[in-house]
Amino acid sequence: MKQQQAGSKIEANKMLVQTFLGCVESGDFGEIFDEIVDENYNDHLQGQSTGRDNLKKYLMAIKTAFPDLKWPVHIIIAEGDFVAVHNQITGTHLADFGPFPASGKRVNVTAFQLYRIVEGKLAEHWELADFPALASQLQS
C-alpha cells in the first residue's frame, strides 16, 4: 500500500509540474498558478528573487518578450519530493528581454529544470539552461 501511495504522490508531483509549465506557456498566472506555487517560492536561478509574486513578474516578462513561448518536455522523472524535467525553450523574440531589444528571431534552447514540491505546491526550482546559446541566437 505504501508503494502505491508513493507512486500516486510521484505522479501527482509530475502532473503539478506539467500544470505549471502549461500556465507559463498559456500566460495564465491567475488562480491555478497561485494554487500550485508556494507563496515563498525559491528560484535558485541567478538573479532571481524569492516569492511567487516575483516569479510571476519574471515569467510575465518572458511571456511578453516571447509571446509564443513553448516548453516542450522531452523527459520528466520524479523521486520523493523532486521532479526533474529535460525540455526545450522555444519562442519568437518580439519584445525587449533584458539587454536584448526585440529582434523577431526564433530561439530554441535546451534546459534542465529541477523542482521541489512541498505540501502539494512548487516550493523550489533549479535550472541549467544553455543561456550562452540563447544570447547568441538573440544577437546573431
Where are these regions (language model features)?
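C-terminal and inter-domain tail/linker signature
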Residues: 1-140
